[in-house]
Structure formats: C-alpha cells, structure tokens
Regions:
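Bacterial signal peptide processing site
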Residues: 1-2
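Long, acidic low-complexity intrinsically disordered regions
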Residues: 9, 13, 20-23, 37
Length: 327
C-alpha cells in the first residue's frame, strides 16, 4: 500500500470494554496463585494467572505509513500506562518491534542513480545509505534497533541491556518505543507483516545467540499487534499457516496468545484502492478471526488508535486471568 489513505472517524470493532469501578479502573484484574495451606480459600483456579507478558509489534515500513506510525506512537503511552495499572504482570514485560522487510530501499550497496536512493535515503541526514547496520538489522523478524531511511528515527535507538527489545527498567520507555517504532517509509513496497511476525517468533531467531534471544518466554503470554495499510496480498503463506506458526511458538497453547491487527477495513471506507480483486485486508481479518475472543481487528485508517488499544487491554486482561503457565 504505497498510496496514502484518508483517516476515518468511525469506531473500531472488537471485544467489549472492561467493567470499571468508580475510579475508572478495571474491576476484572488477573487472578494470581495463592498458596494452598489446606483451609485457605483461593481466588481463581490454582496455578492460573499470567506473571509475564511478551509484546510484539509488527509495523509496516512502506511508503504510505508515516501517519499510521505517528498514530501508533501517540497511542503507546496510554496503552502501556493502562497495562501497568491493570495487569499485575506489568512488572515483567518485554516489548519488541519488528518491521515488514529485510531489504528496504536503503539496503547497501545503494544505487545512487535510482529515484529510491534520492527520495528515501539521501534525503535524510545522515544519509541512510551510510548507516552502519549489523546482520540483525537486515534480518526480517529481528527486533528493530536502528531504523533507517525517510521518516525513520535514523539513529541507533538507546535500548538498555543490549537486547533488541525493551524491558520495564528502560529509563525512558516511551521515548525508546517512539524511536524504534518510527521505522520509517523506506521499506520494501511488498509489505509482509505476517512473515515478519512468524520469523520474529521462530525458534532459530529466539535461540541463544539469535537476534531475538530471550524474547519469547514459555511462561509468558504473547501479545501480537500488527499494523499495515496494504490492500494487497504480499505475505507468503496462508492464514492457516501463520496461525499454526504462532501457535507452535507457544507450544500449542492458544490461551497464551492475543492477536490485534490494525488493517484495511473496506466497509469503513478504509484502504480501498479501487481494485475489486484486491483482498483489502481480508486475509489478515481471517487470521485474526482464528483467535476467537483473543483476536481484535481495528481500522488502520483511524486517526486515533486509543479506543482500539483500550479494547486490546480488556482482551489481554482476560487472557492473563485464564493463563496456566507450563509445568
């Protein structure tokens, strides 16, 4: 989707918002283990309740995504604040951002005679084609650390701890997220968020020594948020194959997974490029629907993603309530 889309003002669809008390806080907090001393009455089922959350954001970095990335970054502070207020697991979360390609327009060696070089790489300071990138920086599915090209941060983002993902101890989490999530618009025009997602969750990239080593934890729930405005079907594979890959990454535990997608919504006038043959997000909608109550579909064209993330927190809260850690 390299054609800009006009924001709409219609609301997102999905799960109901959580019930709140007089303070405005959710009254459906997650359940946590209580030691069984014989006569003590426990709250919730034994061994239920998440204590860890791994957040994966998959962000389209193609030419039409500048405003969408800005909306996502603007919604993040409210989202993470609500997570920290709602989930007791908020003291042990990890946040990773990946983009949708491995060979954007500023991939070396740059062709200095091409319009891509002029329009997406040389225009930024410093020239994106001179960026010193390591192997993980050019691997699809690896956590973003150094966005390059037009409208990107164009710097090495200051993630504390040497990982390609952020922890709660990040000194300025909101600023660091804004840095990595501003992946820019110099990505390959073939947008493949599903492939970025499945590769980010692969056993190889998460193994010791891998680009994302330590990110994917067996005893955490996995929350995937992906965003793309592409009306076409560029991803390799099928919704069933993407579903199977994500499920396998959590050892078949569907209850440990939440999937939220900001995608084209033709019924809302969003990302309709006039091509009657284009799926316009239907393949992604099918994938999201496979997760049942743990799936949420929203419109990428909304100017404000806050209502979408409010709905997402309610779903994450429910997943946290019912999660049974392995072992």
């Amino acid at each position: 989707g390299d054609s800009p889309t006009e924001p709409t003002t219609s609301g997102t669809s999905g799960a109901s918002l959580p019930a709140t008390d007089d303070t405005g806080m959710s009254d459906t907090l997650p359940k946590f283990d209580v030691l069984d001393t014989g006569d003590v009455i426990t709250t919730g089922a034994p061994d239920m309740g998440c204590k860890k959350v791994d957040f994966l954001f998959v962000i389209d970095n193609s030419a039409s995504m500048e405003d969408n990335q800005a909306a996502l970054i603007a919604s993040f502070p409210g989202f993470i604040d609500t997570i920290e207020q709602t989930l007791s697991a908020s003291n042990d979360y990890q946040i990773m951002v990946v983009d949708t390609d491995d060979d954007g327009r500023c991939k070396k060696p740059c062709d200095t005679n091409s319009s891509d070089y002029t329009d997406f790489c040389a225009i930024v300071k410093p020239n994106a084609c001179n960026a010193k990138l390591d192997a993980c920086d050019t691997t699809r599915g690896a956590g973003v650390v150094h966005p390059v090209g037009l409208y990107s941060s164009n710097v090495v983002c200051p993630i504390t701890g040497g990982n390609r993902y952020m922890l709660p101890a990040e000194p300025d989490l909101q600023s660091t997220f804004a840095c990595v999530a501003r992946v820019g618009t110099a990505g390959n025009p073939s947008e493949r968020p599903m492939n970025g997602m499945t590769e980010a969750l692969s056993s190889t990239i998460n193994a010791p020594g891998g680009c994302n080593a330590g990110f994917l934890r067996d005893d955490a729930i996995l929350v995937i948020t992906f965003i793309s405005d592409d009306p076409n079907y560029e991803d390799k594979g099928t919704p069933q194959e993407w579903y199977d890959a994500v499920l396998a990454s959590k050892q078949g535990n569907k209850d440990a997974i939440v999937v939220a997608g900001l995608i084209p919504q033709p019924a809302m006038g969003c990302a309709d490029n006039g091509d009657p043959g284009a799926p316009k997000g239907s393949h992604w909608a099918e994938f999201i629907a496979m997760w049942g109550d743990h799936g949420l579909s929203g419109s990428v064209c909304e100017a404000d993603y806050s209502p979408f993330f409010t709905q997402a927190v309610a779903i994450i809260d429910d997943a946290c309530d019912n999660f049974v850690p392995p072992g």
